């Protein structure tokens, strides 16, 4: 090629790169949504046509996990991990000690916006986002009567007022208004945080999708009662239903829960439609995830204060430019890997304290692996290690260990820990768990100083659960 032609080609390439629009992000975050509540990912009962649309447009992770919690309200650390990119042992739950990823997007020239649930304290909102509307600053409420505030330009919140609509619907309204206001001069990062399908499972009167409890199958790992004391047998969530768990009551709860998921799905559809109709459809990444799963009858439990798959595994769907279409990935990752991945895709420099591993290679080729193992924790009561096939859960306070072969037993119904042929595996996994915990700054012992009996007797009377914080 002659020199003049080479110069012309190089100039054209430079102009093309300069003209390429920056990548936008629309992040939708649910609250307590099990990974198995999406029709396109295998649930034959639930109706989620819009989440199904998103699944077909991108990559759905089948082994994405939250890492655990330091108290019953696991939403708090889960959101802190997501937004900071830091592990459970290393987070500041109030998000004040470390730069958040939304702040990093803002520093990179992005317009940043949040709407919906914020469970990490008011001071961290202006540290993370430039604009925020319809913020529910708390853990849980009746979503038809939720107190919400807007963030003023000063960073202060307006006095709270009762949302005139269902909180998830109004937060979606404000997100759509933000998207409509974008003029293309700056890329944007939008964060829509639902407070559902967290209980109470309330949707607007007249919402047309309904489920008959009799039509809802029980979870494959349903039990009337958990077989031993896991350390949190009477936490608020577990008081939502009497013991032993009646099958009919579990089906009714699941019917209400599925209906709430379907209501959220409608809001997801509104966001997808808005992005599709916008001038920035081709350069916008859409992410759907949840802060945790929840038991809802699995293993005799109702809540999320446990380390079983139904509570730790979360939906994670990513779609957008350069991302594979209609693919599943069994790469293992944490929720706190998601923001580093988005940063990599968008060219945003990571906060210096972010610890997550970016998984952008998986989004291009879903057959690629991510993390070789994952570890989990709930208080000092439960610790776990998952190497992709084998999962060990340790309960120090009762000196009990469980071992599951997730490949053969994905619902964790067959505890293999007592079988002699697995003794060496358990020994090695306990050693690995202990060393990895120590390396991450988790100094909880794997054997408690005081061992209590594993046998547990249910209360004859169920206390009325409080509403605070969960």
Spans of features found by a protein language model:
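Short arginine-rich
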Residues: 438-442
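Formylglycine-dependent sulfatase
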Residues: 14, 18-396, 400-401, 410-431, ...
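N-terminal secretory signal peptides that target proteins for export/translocation
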Residues: 1-3
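Bacterial N-terminal signal peptides
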Residues: 5-16
